[in-house]
Amino acid sequence: MPIMNIEDKLDLEEINKSFVNKESKERIIWAYETFKEGLFLTTSGGKTSAVLPNLTRDSLGFSPPIIFVDLGYFNDCTHNMLKYLENEGYDIRIYKSLISKKEIEEKYPNWSDPDSDYFNKVVSIIKHEPLNRGFKELKVKAWLGGVMSHETEERKTANFVQYNKSICQVLPILDWDHCKINEYLILNKLPLNQNHFDITKGPDQKRECNIWKECGIFRNT
């Protein structure tokens, strides 16, 4: 008799329906109870990146390790957010491209223009490959992401729980609005990274850079 994977056992439609009426902490607890040590967090070091680790620690009494992909192009504000998380005792696992920034810029000049023929190629090199490598090395079964549906058009169609490439993504604060996220930041005295800039998201910072296809984000099932 074949062994069933967790993915085969989960009724995603029912889980997502039930999550509509659950608190964010309950969603996090469900994720840990389901995936145990296979659960990780991800962070971009972005504007509200202090929220999910804090909420997770408050929900579970601890936080699973946090995966950060260093694109090689982040500013000091984003690196300071990572330092803050490290100073707060979070276990940060950093992954980066195996190709140096210098090599990339020599081989793919002006790649950061979204209209460049090189744009998607370099995004894959500096973001998708390191993240997938991290997932494989750490044996990630599921990961918590801190995205919210109001942030981009594509995120409006995301589910609380979804699968891609045998990895489950759980978005516990998907339904938070501006007021709720700001209230949480203030009540918990958390830092805000107003100057975060992700070069892979383009000048308007709205691109999802196909990461849902490559690393399991925002794929509806």
Briefly describe each language-model feature range.
Residues 2-221:
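Nucleotide-activated chemistry modules centered on ATP-dependent adenylation/adenylyltransferase
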